[in-house]
């Protein structure tokens, strides 16, 4: 009996610690907002871009899951530096969102994750609900002005 009580207490403690964490750090939100402004994304498309970041959750070079495995030759893998890589990956994802998202996650999922589109759309829907709940349905931070971000 004691083991079960201890297990429950540990589970509740870990849930409480996780509940205070943001899904996306403020620093990344600022970069996502900048990319979204540069690509003229709507608020709905900006939420989707943030959701892609959270769902893909890749390391530097794969932050938005663009281009398949590292070293595959895809141009989105130009940088291993976290800052540059985030912007390049985010720009590729933003372009895909801008050109192909029409309000239907299942249809978009077939484009973004063709191997598992239905599951991708289901997970994305859940992530979007969580992100919007964390921020009270408002995109975090101020909307930045457009600016060019160029890397050599």
Which positions does each model-derived feature cover?
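Sec/Tat signal peptide C-region and signal peptidase I cleavage site
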Residues: 15-20
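Catalytic glycan-binding domains that act on GlcNAc-containing polysaccharides
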Residues: 21-151
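Positively charged n-region of N-terminal signal peptides that target proteins for export
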Residues: 1-4
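Bacterial N-terminal signal peptides
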Residues: 7-14
